[in-house]
Amino acid sequence: MIKQYFKQALAQLRQQPLLTTISVLGTALTICLIMVVVMQQQIKTTPFAPESNRNRLLHVKQMSTSNKNWSDDGSSNGPMGLQTAKGCFEGLTTAEEVSIYTIPETMQVALPRGVRTGIDALETDGAFWRIFDFSFIDGKPYSDAEVKSGLPVAVITESVARLLFGTSHQVSGKEILVNDAVYRISGVVKDVSSMASTAYAQIWVPYSSTHITGGDNTWCDGIMGVMRVVILARSSSDFEAIRAECERRRLAYNSGLGDYFVFYRGQPDDQLTMSQHKWANVQPDMAAYFRQQVIIFLILLLVPAINLSSMTHSRLRQRVAEIGVRRSFGATRGGVMGQIVAENLVLTLMAGVVGLLFCLIISYCWGGTLFADSRLMYLNTAPVIEWKMLFKFSTFIYALLFCLALNLLSSGWPAWRASRMSIINALSGKLN
């Protein structure tokens, strides 16, 4: 039966090449557009190295503090200070790992007596390397002991290593200048795409090796600063337990702050919520976000479905007599309707394959523009999109589901009308 549907679909392609080609290309462009929208969100949430554990990550990228002497709506918002990060999150018993790291910054690197170059930097602790799966091609990450001691060690990417030394191998142990201070290279990792929103940098150093945790980088008595926290859960089912422990830690921390107190604004966030958490003082409305996504997909599906439905209706006009003959020889209305929908599904799936290929090519070639957001404007490198970030099994599932939905929307009504017409009208070539 399925083989027969394929034959019938190919026969239509030969008999009505222009109409069928327009229909297939229209469907392909629709699927392409929908999949680009899906990938724009997917690339923010789907795991890929070095953020392969995204489905187990919780984030606290900013928070708020207020004071009993301030007005009711008065608050200071932004990243936290180191004392807050340690007081509220370090050593969580319900989590597998907790890492404290800084907001992205630019550091100047150079060889002694060399030309300085600005690159993207993160300052982290040792747990950072156990949460994210970087690919080391030389050396190793710096350890907890090195962070505790404040040693000037660094991990750099292979492109930075080639820029400085002309090679990315046998670089560990050598010295470079980082903001005019001498650092020893601990390891070299493969380049990281800037789409890895938490792990991305070109150089990583211990936050204890600089002065970033104090001085002008903190305010509100050290409560606020430039630190962030990422939490690795043993399982996503532990998220609520982790949030509950974070809340207990917050209350205990507040008890020692005097007139100050901190609050999380709904955090820790999972990966999806974090991607929508744009402002430090506003908790994202995820219900509104999901409604917006549903409306977008309905528009993207319904508008082309109406056009494709009229094309399906035009193709059926040329098959009215055939439908009448089938009905006169005992074919049921359900059988006629099912065959029309199935034949149209074959064409829709063909178009879906073409549309998915279009989408992958467009995303790979122009992904830096399609998937860029305001965060990337402040980085020193352009966004890099890799096949492994786009080529996911879930991508095929989404494409298949949209093909099925588009097929039902575009062929359901014409098929129903064709199955309901009288045998006499069908044999006389009338499609009312």
Each model region followed by its residue ranges:
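C-terminal membrane-exit region of the final transmembrane helix in multipass inner-membrane proteins
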Residues: 5, 25, 392-432
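Hydrophobic alpha-helical transmembrane segments of multi-pass inner-membrane transport and secretion
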Residues: 15-44, 284-321, 349-354, 405-406
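Transmembrane alpha-helical interface segments in multi-pass membrane proteins
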Residues: 18-29, 321-367, 398, 402-406, ...
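Membrane-proximal extracellular/periplasmic loop immediately following the first transmembrane helix
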Residues: 37-108, 115, 223-226, 373-384
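Short acidic/polar micro-motifs at solvent-exposed secondary-structure junctions
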Residues: 62-78, 96-127, 140-154, 192-193, ...
